[in-house]
């Protein structure tokens, strides 16, 4: 067997020049291949190099995946947003006719595995650094943070594609002695969904003892690990709702609380607030928050246009507080089949335009509702309703009651739709609760007509195709059903 010199690694990065991005060329950039480089067992030798590896993990929040795709995937594939813009790759995705050569799909695969590789560098090599200024305690903390982040990225990947390769070693150089090991890295097989979730849980549970304190809102903290664990146990095949309750019990001891003013979550003046569990810290530097320009503004047709459905949901509920914080209407120079140019809606949760916009990876209201979902599944309808009503009381809405499992799931889904609109959650909520095909196949326009593309959704479309470019390069990868 001969290993081609030009092997394309699974670990790919992507480059983006924000200043040159327009709605027509969004997502059309090609990834940059990370080539093999010789590495010893001690490629990093100083505390400064170790801290640089950690900085790289967090600076990934400036990447296109986090600044744009995460929100597009979670809302434009659901009933809270239309695709917006004019990019055909986006239209495929938002209309449930995605194909294996879609560049959004390949870029997100490359980005997620690139992020995982950044985590693996810390996990593989930080223990070998002998610099005395890098303490044993700091090494443990670094590894805990990297483990939480790796788990988060595998959690995203397994929800998007199902079975995915499990790679736990950083890219290494190729030589005759390590050929078989490198071959398995370069040409990995897909692990089962159960195996992926096992690694995710192991990473998160193993990180709890050494993770930064939950008061560190901008780091992968103990609270972040608890929050992700709760979501993982609610989402994995054969969910463990007792575990969800247990981890949200622990989360409740970490000092989090709901902000009394909903808009303070998004106004830029209350960063690292009491409700924030894990917050990406836009700083106009290493994390330049450019997503705002993709979602709001009248200079060109933006992405993630709020849907008639979500605006109607706010109106029907009398939810003026969250509607005003979530959606803003402007006069624009264009019109489409959904909205008139005189009152065109934009997402309003990301509204800071100086590069310092933050966003939430996890916040407490989200986890209260995940806990409520678990309570419903366990038959505690009164306890579930009490949790939902905490969230509703914050915005002046009357309490609900829950009478059955289906009633509870439907009411919690509606509450999550209103509370977490445009935060990248809806697609995954619908999948997790088994409601995606039922709800998305009946999506309607502002006149009550079922959207022409709604019939495209089916069970196969709930997972993305494995990127064709990866299959072409890797004989061990198989395609998802229906692609």
PLM ranges: what are they?
Residues 197, 239-241, 381:
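TPR-repeat structural position
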């Amino acid at each position: 067997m001969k290993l081609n010199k030009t092997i394309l690694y699974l670990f790919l990065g992507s480059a983006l020049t924000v200043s040159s991005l327009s709605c027509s060329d969004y997502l059309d950039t090609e990834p940059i291949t990370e080539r093999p480089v010789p590495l010893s067992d001690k490629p990093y030798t100083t505390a400064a190099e170790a801290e640089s590896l950690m900085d790289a993990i967090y600076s990934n929040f400036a990447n296109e995946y986090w600044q744009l795709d995460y929100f597009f995937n979670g809302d434009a594939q659901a009933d809270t947003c239309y695709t917006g813009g004019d990019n055909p790759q986006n239209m495929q995705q938002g209309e449930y006719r995605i194909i294996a050569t879609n560049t959004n799909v390949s870029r997100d695969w490359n980005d997620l595995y690139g992020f995982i590789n950044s985590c693996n560098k810390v996990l593989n090599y930080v223990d070998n650094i002998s610099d005395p200024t890098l303490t044993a305690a700091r090494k443990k903390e670094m590894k805990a943070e990297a483990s939480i982040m790796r788990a988060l990225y595998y959690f995203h990947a397994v929800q998007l594609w199902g079975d995915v390769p499990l790679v736990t070693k950083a890219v290494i150089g190729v030589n005759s002695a390590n050929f078989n090991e490198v071959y398995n890295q370069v040409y990995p097989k897909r692990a089962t969904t159960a195996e992926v979730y096992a690694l995710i849980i192991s990473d998160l549970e193993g990180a709890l003892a050494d993770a930064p304190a939950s008061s560190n809102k901008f780091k992968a903290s103990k609270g972040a690990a608890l929050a992700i664990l709760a979501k993982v146990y609610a989402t994995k095949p054969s969910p463990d709702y007792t575990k969800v309750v247990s981890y949200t019990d622990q989360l409740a001891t970490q000092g989090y609380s709901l902000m009394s003013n909903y808009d303070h979550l998004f106004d830029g003046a209350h960063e690292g607030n009491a409700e924030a569990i894990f917050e990406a810290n836009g700083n106009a530097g290493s994390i330049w928050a450019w997503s705002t320009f993709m979602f709001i503004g009248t200079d060109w047709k933006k992405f993630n246009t709020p849907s008639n459905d979500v605006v109607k949901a706010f109106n029907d509920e009398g939810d003026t507080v969250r509607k005003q914080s979530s959606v803003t209407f402007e006069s624009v120079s264009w019109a489409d089949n959904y909205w008139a140019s005189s009152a065109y809606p934009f997402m309003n949760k990301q509204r800071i335009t100086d590069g310092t916009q933050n966003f939430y990876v996890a916040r407490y209201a989200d986890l209260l509702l995940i806990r409520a979902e678990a309570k419903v599944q366990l038959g505690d309808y009164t306890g579930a309703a009490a949790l939902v009503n905490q969230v509703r009381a914050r915005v002046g809405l009357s309490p609900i009651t829950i009478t059955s499992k289906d009633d509870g799931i439907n009411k919690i889904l509606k509450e999550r739709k209103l509370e977490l609109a445009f935060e990248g959650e809806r697609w995954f909520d619908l999948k997790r609760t088994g409601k995606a095909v039922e709800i998305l196949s009946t999506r309607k326009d502002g006149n009550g007509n079922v959207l022409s593309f709604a019939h495209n959704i089916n069970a196969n479309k709930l997972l993305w195709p494995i990127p064709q470019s990866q299959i072409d390069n890797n004989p061990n990868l198989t395609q998802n059903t229906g692609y």
